[in-house]
A protein has these predicted regions:
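Extended, non-catalytic structural segments that build the interaction scaffolds
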Residues: 17-23, 305-331
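Structural motif
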Residues: 7-15, 110-116, 351-361
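An internal, acidic/charged active-site-proximal segment
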Residues: 164-294, 382-388
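Short, conserved catalytic/metal-binding motifs centered on acidic residues
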Residues: 34-35, 51, 81-95, 123, ...
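Basic, amphipathic alpha-helical segments enriched in Lys/Arg and hydrophobic/aromatic residues
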Residues: 346-403
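Active-site-proximal, Lys/Arg-enriched surface segment
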Residues: 54-155
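Short amphipathic alpha-helical "interface-anchor" segments enriched in bulky aromatics
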Residues: 89-91, 319-351
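Gly/serine-rich nucleotide phosphate-binding loop at the start of the catalytic core
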Residues: 1-61
Length: 411
């Protein structure tokens, strides 16, 4: 009941609760599909339009919901091992409609066809036991090219009537407003971190991300909060090596060939408890814009024949083991993406309204966390005999929720 205070009315809260449950249990995770599977008590059925209004149009705030969500999750990450916040972005595919908010056409290199997708910037916190989404922000659509083309086509050499001048000025101001309102993925990531640090629910959590969101503004903000970060960098990044600016790949190759002994063998315990062997070279170097940072070059084979991984951190006192162990917390956010897309309806909502899309992503995060907290049944079932006593698979949790839902219908 921690989320009840977010909603104005009991009926609205009940509709949202049904929607979250439907995101986990319904095969069709749209509101239409969820509503179609609800078994209403006699005399209590409401229209689908009423449920739609309660979930997507009522006066509750998705921002307040996520603040409550983050505050509710915070105790789960205290005293249960190290916690690290991961930052990333993902694509939510909508191949059948360009009218969904934020969906834009692009070529899908996986399926080798044109498709539509939303760009969603996410943040997730992870410890050795679980991973939870903390933020999901959809990138607003960018229509600058179309608007600029329209302005070029409708341009006139002179305007005889004041009404024409006012109309043209209004069009130019709208274009300027949209241009200023355009937000890059990296800017959205900075805003998310600023919000997380302002709330202060995860004071001990460092950050891990890759070069897709790495910017000077982001690292400066994290460092100003007294925290550390680890990021993978591209192999063409320039570093100051022996008095000259060189690409990190040009630094790594001579080291591998001429001084293989500089790569120290280490055994690192990763986030999931797995022990991994690495061969690492670590040194504090200077980078353009970022200043002095620790560079760690990682190989995972003893003969150094694999492609190296280049990690960068502001923690100058960390060794290669600590840096790589922190970097292992970057991958749970990929698990969160898969989890949310396949089990919590991240890509299911066919909504054209900006507020409705944001609410759906927030409720998907809530559903993903709710599933991890569900109590388990059926330990002695043959279906789950592969799991030991300490494991509680996601399938078993969904099985428990489905049984509870059926039991409520029967009763």
């Amino acid at each position: 009941m921690a989320y009840r205070e977010v909603f104005c009315r009991d009926n609205g809260f009940e509709h949202v609760s049904r929607y979250v449950q439907g995101l986990l249990l319904s095969a069709n995770k749209t509101l239409q599909g969820i509503y179609a599977q609800i078994v209403w008590p006699e005399g209590e059925q409401v229209s689908r339009r009423a449920m739609h209004a309660a979930v997507f149009e009522a006066g509750w705030s998705h921002e307040e919901l996520m603040r409550t969500h983050r505050r509710t999750l915070a105790p789960q990450y205290r005293g249960r091992g190290r916690a690290v916040i991961g930052l990333d972005w993902t694509l939510a595919y909508h191949p059948y409609s360009e009218k969904i908010y934020g969906a834009k056409p692009a070529y899908d290199y996986v399926h080798r066809c044109w498709s539509c997708y939303q760009t969603v910037v996410t943040a997730a916190v992870a410890n050795p036991h679980r991973v939870d989404g903390l933020a999901a922000e959809v990138q607003p659509p960018n229509y600058q090219k179309a608007e600029l083309a329209y302005l070029a086509v409708t341009q006139q050499e002179s305007y005889e009537q004041m009404e024409q001048v006012q109309t043209r000025l209004s069009e130019l101001l709208h274009y300027h407003q949209h241009r200023l309102g355009d937000r890059k993925r990296t800017e959205m990531a900075v805003d998310i971190v600023r919000q997380l640090e302002a709330e202060g629910d995860y004071p001990q959590a460092d950050y891990a991300f890759d070069q897709g969101v790495l910017t000077h503004a982001l690292t400066t903000l994290i460092e100003s909060a007294g925290k550390h970060w680890v990021s993978e960098i591209e192999r063409t990044r320039l570093v100051l090596w022996k008095g000259q600016w060189q690409q990190v790949q040009m630094v790594a190759e001579p080291l591998r060939k001429d001084h293989p002994e500089s790569f120290r063998h280490k055994k690192v315990r990763c986030r999931n408890g797995e022990m991994r062997e690495i061969w690492a070279f670590s040194k504090v170097l200077r980078l353009k814009k970022y200043g002095r940072k620790r560079l760690v070059i990682i190989h995972e084979t003893a003969d150094l024949s694999d492609t190296p991984r280049f990690l960068l951190t502001d923690a100058l006192h960390w060794d290669a083991s600590r840096t790589f162990a922190t970097w292992s917390f970057r991958w749970p956010i990929e698990t969160f993406h898969q989890f949310a897309k396949h089990l919590a309806g991240f890509e299911a909502a066919q909504l054209r309204n900006q507020e409705a899309v944001k609410r759906h992503f927030c409720l998907s995060c809530v559903a993903q966390s709710a599933l991890q907290q569900a109590s388990c049944q059926g330990q002695k079932s043959e279906r789950f005999e592969f799991a030991d006593e300490s494991q509680q698979p996601i399938g078993q949790r969904r099985y428990s929720l489905a049984r509870e839902a059926v039991q409520q219908v029967v009763e």
